[in-house]
C-alpha cells in the first residue's frame, strides 16, 4: 500500500492556503461536513418520519453517531493490533466515510429510493449508495466538475458495493404496473452498486489495484438481501478495510440507536424484546453476552432515563469491543486483504437487534404509510419534470439537462440527481404546488438546491 497513490485526487489541486497544515483526510472531512448535501440530512427521514416527534434521529444525527462509533472501533483496533497501525493511520478518514455514508439517500427513506429506482428502471436505476458516490465525486459544487474531489482512499472507502449496475442487474419476473399507486417495493428492489454513468470515476478509484485484485474485488455472486424475501439481482462480495469499519458502525447505530428511538416512543415493547431477543442472548455461546446482555431488557425499558442510556452504552461498547481484523490473503493490496469483522456470537446478537427494528418499526403500518406517501410524491415529481424538463426544472438544472442531451448522455440521471437531493419537506411542498388546487398561486421561489 503506497500512501501517496491513495491520497491522490482526481483533479490536481495547488491550493496554498496560509498556515494550513491539515492532512489530506482532514481536508476531506471538512469538505463533507461543510457541504450542502450533508446539511440536508437534517431534514431527511432515518427510520421514523420527519415531523412525527422531535426526539427521534434524522439522517444527520444518525451520521454523527455512526462517525462516533466508527472512530471508537478504530481506537479499539489500534490497541488490539499495533502491527496494523498503517491501516489505521487516520481517524479523519474514518470520520469522513461515516459522515458521508448516507449523503446520497433521497427524501422519504426507502420509499423514495424505490420510487426513483422504478422511474429510472430504463435509465440505469437508482440506489442511495450509488448516489453517495456520485455526489462526492461529481455533483457537490466544491469544484466545477469533480464534486468534492476527495482522496482516492476516501472514495474507495465509500464503495459499499464495488460493481456497476449493468454487471449486477437481473430482470425480475413481474408485470409492468399501470398506475404508480400499484408499485410494490418488493418487486422493484434497487441494484446495490455504482451507476454506469459513473464508470470513469469508478475506474480511477481502482487504478492502483493489480488486475487480479481489481477483478476479484468487483466480482459478483447470487445472493439474497437480508431485508427482502426475494432479491433477484447479483451482489458484490468484498469491500475495503475502511469501508468495513464504516459499515459496522452503521449497523451498530441502526440496531442500537434506532431501537432506542422506538423504545422511547413506545413502538417496541418489553414483551416483544423478551419474545424476540432475550432467548438468543440468554443462549449465546459467548459468556459476556449471557452475563451482561441477558437481563439488559429491564434497563432498556426502564422509566428511569439514566438506566436506559446506560443500557444503550453497554450494547454499543459490547459490539465495538468485539470487532476483530480478519485477513483474506488472496488479495495483494492491504486495504482489501484486511477487513474489520464482528466475532460470530456478537454478529448473531446484532442481527437479532436489527431484525427487531425491522419487524416492529420498519414494517409497522404507520411507518409503511409514510413510505408509501413519499413513494407517490417522488414518482409524481419525476413524472412531472420528465414531461417537460425545460419548463419545470430550476434554471441551473435545466442547463445540466440540456448539456446532457446535447452530449448524448443519460439526461434522466439529471432528474434523479435533482429529486434525490431534496429534503422530505421540500419535496412534499413542491408536490403540493404542482398538484394541489389548494396550494394557491404563490409558487415558492427558492435558490437552486
UniProtKB/Swiss-Prot annotation:
Gene3D superfamilies xref list: Hypothetical protein af1432
Family matches, as SMART domains: HDc
Region named Disordered: 1-27
A molecular function GO annotation: dGTPase activity
One family name in Pfam for this protein: HD_assoc
Source domain of life: Bacteria
GO biological process: dGTP catabolic process
Keywords: Hydrolase
Occurrences of domain HD (ranges): 59-255
Biased composition (Basic and acidic residues): 7-27
InterPro entries: dGTPase, dGTPase-like, dNTPase_2, HD/PDEase_dom, HD_domain, PHydrolase_assoc_dom
Hydrolase as UniProt keyword: yes
Family according to the record: Belongs to the dGTPase family. Type 2 subfamily.
Name of this chain's protein: Deoxyguanosinetriphosphate triphosphohydrolase-like protein
